[in-house]
Amino acid sequence: MRSSLFKSGLEKAPHRSLLYALGLTKEEMRRPLIGVVNSANEVVPGHIHLNTIAEAVKAGIRLAGGTPMTFPVIGVCDGLAMNHAGMHFSLVSREIIADSIEIMASAHPFDALVCIPNCDKVVPGMLMAMLRLNIPAVIVSGGPMLAGTTSEGSFDLIDVFEAVGKFKRGAINEDQLEELEENACPGCGSCSGMFTANSMNCLSESVGLGLPGNGTIPAVSAKRVRLAKTAGMRVMDLLEKNIRPRDIVTAKSIENAVTMDMALGCSTNTVLHLPAVFAEAGLPLTLDIFDAVSRKTPNLCKLSPAGKHYLDDLERAGGIPAVMSELAKRGLLHLDVMTATGKTLGENLTDLKARVKNFDVIRAKEPYANEGGIAILRGSLAPDGAVVKQSAVAPAMMRHTGPARVFDSEEAANKAILGGEIKAGDVVVIRYEGPQGGPGMREMLSPTSNIMGMGLGETVALITDGRFSGGTRGAAIGHVSPEAAEGGPIALIRDGDRIEVDIPGRKLDVLVDAAELEARRASVVAPEKVIESPLLRRYASLVKSAAQGAVYKDPAAK
């Protein structure tokens, strides 16, 4: 056993003394020691209930003959960090989470791990650690929040973000805004649409590192507790069979995950997180792969913000297995890949008798589109690529040309949008918000929501070297690479330059002569930013571009 490194033999007598201090018995020490990574806290709605999930996981481990040992990691709520300086720290936390798990599981060599995340950066951070350590492991999330309800129907947190702009233009009153904010988030769980947290939870199930149901069983359901107990038992079986994360994550299962990403209409943040996760296994995932898979994968689901359905609707419609069964019928999935059940994907789908139970939620017969939810754009404005959630773009904005309105920060753009300075036809450009330039690549949910709330969602595009919340909708194009801080073309744009967006043609161009653009370079002055945080200064010096998943540079790499 790996744990023998700190519990077995004469020389480990002092170590056992410390384990006795925990209250462990000799029998508990003899058993496999399983690390339970718990990101519970009292700050994040998606994590407030994770101690309940952790207790269920521990019960499952004990049922199967193991000894659980819990340790914590941080978890940031992107909603609470949005639209202020706190958002600089969100993406940074992904790397901190992965590193902290590596530290704990190396200093204390557990035999296996069960990881319990739920929200945006915690899921990829834990997946990165699982593949980096490559010891038997299962991920079991806290589950999605139920949608909010009023007398007018269901809604979610994004409706509240958009309501700010509606209030500013007089479309709703203060009482209506208050009703929305008090009812949008009815309880624990990751926010109820196909935003980043739920996207990553669904994809952790799709790639095989999470058990069936991990992505969609609601946080408040007893099924979620039973799933957690099962995860605790399953990790013991994986340990016995020596099935490790890199046995599950292969080139085939990566293609499965990206295919599911496109079919589900997931968050554009998956284009940052999946490459970062799979890089830990030495498996490349490029923007070209995303786009190639998107072109051949139908968009079967439009959950909020792209449509009217929520994660609990998807669960009732058959969940991730139902979507996978439909894609399998089309020959779009590899069914021979191993999963955390100890069986192949094909065996899982057969055992589950996976089928679609609601063809309005999962459009298997009449897909929303013949292409996937995400498109990769390139052109003179984004030579290394940019990302758009095309499934959440209005048809009228799939092609758009308009004058640039350029801002060097999110705050400046927000002020202009809410101040009525942005007009129909404009292209809002927000730069110096990339991984290095931000630093931390803040999410532009407030600007995109304010564009919607101000009634400009079908006439205004937004382009940024920052990123978006999974709750963003509209012609919102992010991850523009190279970013402004690296001297990318986005740094050379001026107010009034014509910007051409062609999503079907996968093009993003600034309609200025290349020689003229280059001549501007000498006069470009980056905004002066005083970065007081040593952590953010370190991050800015180490992080790669968004096109490479915004991972750290490897000092050993040539």
UniProtKB/Swiss-Prot annotation:
Cofactors, names only: [2Fe-2S] cluster; Mg(2+)
Catalytic site: 469
Cofactor mode of binding and number, as noted: Binds 1 [2Fe-2S] cluster per subunit. This cluster acts as a Lewis acid cofactor.
InterPro entries: Dihydro-acid_dehy_C, DihydroxyA_deHydtase, DiOHA_6PGluconate_deHydtase_CS, ILV_EDD_C, ILV_EDD_N, IlvD/EDD_N
A single BP term in Gene Ontology: isoleucine biosynthetic process
Catalytic activity reported: (2R)-2,3-dihydroxy-3-methylbutanoate = 3-methyl-2-oxobutanoate + H2O; (2R,3R)-2,3-dihydroxy-3-methylpentanoate = (S)-3-methyl-2-oxopentanoate + H2O
Residues with the N6-carboxylysine modification: 121
Gene3D superfamilies assigned: IlvD/EDD C-terminal domain-like
Keyword annotations from UniProtKB, A to Z: 2Fe-2S, Amino-acid biosynthesis, Branched-chain amino acid biosynthesis, Iron, Iron-sulfur, Lyase, Magnesium, Metal-binding
Residue numbers binding Mg(2+): 78, 120-121, 443
Pathway linked to the protein: Amino-acid biosynthesis; L-isoleucine biosynthesis; L-isoleucine from 2-oxobutanoate: step 3/4; Amino-acid biosynthesis; L-valine biosynthesis; L-valine from pyruvate: step 3/4
Pfam families: ILV_EDD_C, ILVD_EDD_N
One term of GO molecular function: 2 iron, 2 sulfur cluster binding
Binding positions for [2Fe-2S] cluster per the UniProt entry: 119, 191
EC number(s) on file: 4.2.1.9
Subunit structure: Homodimer.
NCBIfam families to which the protein is assigned, alphabetical: ilvD (TIGR00110), PRK00911.1 (NF002068)
Protein family according to the UniProt entry: Belongs to the IlvD/Edd family.
Protein name as annotated: Dihydroxy-acid dehydratase
Gene this chain is encoded by: ilvD
